[in-house]
Amino acid sequence: MKAIIVLLMVVTSNADRICTGITSSNSPHVVKTATQGEVNVTGVIPLTTTPTKSHFANLKGTKTRGKLCPKCLNCTDLDVALARPKCTGTIPSAKASILHEVKPVTFGCFPIMHDRTKIRQLPNLLRGYEHIRLSTHNVINAETAPGGPYKIGTSRSCPNVTNGNGFFATMAWAVPKNDNNKTATNPLTVEVPYICTEGEDQITVWGFHSDNETQMVKLYGDSKPQKFTSSANGVTTHYVSQIGGFPNQAEDGGLPQSGRIVVDYMVQKSGKTGTITYQRGILLPQKVWCASGRSKVIKGSLPLIGEADCLHEKYGGLNKSKPYYTGEHAKAIGNCPIWVKTPLKLANGTKYRPPAKLLKER
């Protein structure tokens, strides 16, 4: 109690000017705090940036996949996925991939009914694997499959490397070889063995051909709609072919086609057998995709220019200059800043206090 009285005496009798608090110059920095609202501070470090849109780039520290087959000229990713003639080549391994074709289509060969199946998803399915390769051997002998013997159909619209008639390497167009087996048939079943290396997923492409009644009788001896079923890895899919009603369509300078093909795929896990049940017009599986590992996929555009820390669906390639960013929120891969709704600042100074008022001597 005595100490307090003495202190008061000193303040009132000996000090004519006492300044309390911290004196500093005026500060333009304002931060919003959780407990005190907006507060002036003597210094801040910005933690956020607002990116500007840029081209997509290769992700630093890893290989980034643009086109499935960069050296396959004049080929779409679906052409590569179906192994169209002149569209086969090495697919580089990659831990990150750019989804640059929203609705993949084939550039030529036989007219495909893209929207009857999930075939448009095939390039993106393959893109999601780190390692992808096309088998060197056919998965089944199409010529001697049930319902045969068959001759393997080709098309002038699918020129091969010698500019002869060709077809997709992933499928064999099974056409009855002679008049004796150009007849209607009950559903037939073929087993599709697993031929990839243990641990790889096997992606098996198959399909069926249909045409107008005249052509169906000429090719297969049956003009009725045909039934097809695939089954693998617990997934079963059914189709019935459509007969006729297609306008003539030419692909890559070939003859006008009145027919269409429907193409699908099934995924066979390591060591697992698949089955296909079919009637006339079957496109039997041949070369299969063997795939392993995982590649992160993000929507973007080509070409890939330079390198970046982060790939962002809305902004392209970003280099991380701040830990957070504001702007459009979207999927991003790599060493990316974190999205926040409003800018963040880190106060690296002290709370600003105006100079204390002078106490006048009594």
From Swiss-Prot:
Keywords: Disulfide bond, Fusion of virus membrane with host endosomal membrane, Fusion of virus membrane with host membrane, Glycoprotein, Hemagglutinin, Host cell membrane, Host membrane, Host-virus interaction, Lipoprotein, Membrane, Palmitate, Signal, Transmembrane, Viral attachment to host cell, Viral envelope protein, Viral penetration into host cytoplasm, Virion, Virus entry into host cell. In natural infection, inactive HA is matured into HA1 and HA2 outside the cell by one or more trypsin-like, arginine-specific endoprotease secreted by the bronchial epithelial cells. One identified protease that may be involved in this process is secreted in lungs by club cells. Palmitoylated. InterPro entries: Capsid_hemagglutn, Hemagglutn_HA1_a/b_dom_sf, Hemagglutn_influenz_A/B. One of its GO terms (cellular component) is membrane. Belongs to the influenza viruses hemagglutinin family. Major glycoprotein, comprises over 80% of the envelope proteins present in virus particle. The extent of infection into host organism is determined by HA. Influenza viruses bud from the apical surface of polarized epithelial cells (e.g. bronchial epithelial cells) into lumen of lungs and are therefore usually pneumotropic. The reason is that HA is cleaved by tryptase clara which is restricted to lungs. However, HAs of H5 and H7 pantropic avian viruses subtypes can be cleaved by furin and subtilisin-type enzymes, allowing the virus to grow in other organs than lungs. This is Hemagglutinin. The gene is HA.
